[in-house]
């Protein structure tokens, strides 16, 4: 089983704020995510600027595309994104359109599982050639005190068994990682637990050490 990658989510409102994080920890992570909040705040220039600074890193545009899949994904890929996200409630043709464009750029598409989705949809995504999904505990659910549970683990295992590369996100803390041991997680996303730590560098390194211990 290969080691899960570590992704930092830049859900900052401005580039200046995002740079405060990347200056410290860009070299400690595998993937730099231009979060939805930053995408809205700064547009695709955030993707372009971060990829220019860190060309050796995977840069994800978390656009959560809901419609106009070809147009929006092309905007992201032309800004040099490596991956883009499509929201799970989008029509299957939106996901297919985004994937078609991704292939032109040797990029990839992730389906963001935020909110309601079905296993029938999951099979449609697989049939369409989608390889990546993001299992997401929403920010609002976290705020309401919803913790990771057995239902989450069961769903993640099922998605993996279907052949998806699964990314896990949603207020992920270091102590949560053992919950996923034994599952071939593709990526773990940490946002505030790294960005807001007393030492973001040490927080990122602790995540990497724990991943190596649990999956190595």
UniProtKB/Swiss-Prot annotation:
Enzyme class: lyase
Lineage: Bacteria, Pseudomonadati, Pseudomonadota, Gammaproteobacteria, Enterobacterales
Domain of life: Bacteria
Residues flagged as site, Transition state stabilizer: 64, 67
Classification via NCBIfam families: PRK13306.1
Similarity section: Belongs to the HPS/KGPDC family. KGPDC subfamily.
Function statement: Catalyzes the decarboxylation of 3-keto-L-gulonate-6-P into L-xylulose-5-P. Is involved in the anaerobic L-ascorbate utilization.
Keywords for this protein: Carbohydrate metabolism, Decarboxylase, Lyase, Magnesium, Metal-binding
Cofactor binding: number and manner: Binds 1 Mg(2+) ion per subunit.
Cofactor: Mg(2+)
Pathway where it operates: Cofactor degradation; L-ascorbate degradation; D-xylulose 5-phosphate from L-ascorbate: step 2/4
SMART domains: OMPdecase
UniProt: substrate binding residues: 11, 192
Family annotation (Pfam families): OMPdecase (PF00215)
GO process terms (BP): 'de novo' pyrimidine nucleobase biosynthetic process; L-ascorbic acid catabolic process
Ligand binding (Mg(2+)): 33, 62
Protein name per its UniProtKB record: 3-keto-L-gulonate-6-phosphate decarboxylase UlaD
Organism of derivation: Escherichia coli O139:H28 (strain E24377A / ETEC)
EC number: 4.1.1.85
GO molecular function annotation: 3-dehydro-L-gulonate-6-phosphate decarboxylase activity; magnesium ion binding; orotidine-5'-phosphate decarboxylase activity
Disulfide bonds: none
InterPro entries for this protein: 3-keto-L-gulonate6Pdecase_UlaD, Aldolase_TIM, HPS/KGPDC, OMPdeCOase_dom, RibuloseP-bd_barrel
Assembly notes: Homodimer.
Catalysis: reaction(s): 3-dehydro-L-gulonate 6-phosphate + H(+) = L-xylulose 5-phosphate + CO2
Induction: Induced by L-ascorbate. Repressed by UlaR.
């Amino acid at each position: 089983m290969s080691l899960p990658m570590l992704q930092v989510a830049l859900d900052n409102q401005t580039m200046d704020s995002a740079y405060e994080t990347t200056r410290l920890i860009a070299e400690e992570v595998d993937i730099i995510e231009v979060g939805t909040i930053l995408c809205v705040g700064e547009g695709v220039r955030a993707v372009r600027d971060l990829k220019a600074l860190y060309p050796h890193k995977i840069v994800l545009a978390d656009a959560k595309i809901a419609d106009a899949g070809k147009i929006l994904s092309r905007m992201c890929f032309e800004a040099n994104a490596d991956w883009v996200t499509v929201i799970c409630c989008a029509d299957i043709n939106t996901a297919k359109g985004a994937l078609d464009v991704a292939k032109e750029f040797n990029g990839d598409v992730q389906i963001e599982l935020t909110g309601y989705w079905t296993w029938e949809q999951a099979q449609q995504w697989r049939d369409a050639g989608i390889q990546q999904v993001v299992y997401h505990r929403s920010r609002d659910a976290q705020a309401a005190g919803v913790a990771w549970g057995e239902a989450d683990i069961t769903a993640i295992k099922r998605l993996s068994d279907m052949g998806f590369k699964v990314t896990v996100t949603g207020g992920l803390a270091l102590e949560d990682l053992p919950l996923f041991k034994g599952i071939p997680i593709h990526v773990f996303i940490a946002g505030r637990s790294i960005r807001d730590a007393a030492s973001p560098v040490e927080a990122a390194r602790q995540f990497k050490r724990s991943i190596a211990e649990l999956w190595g």
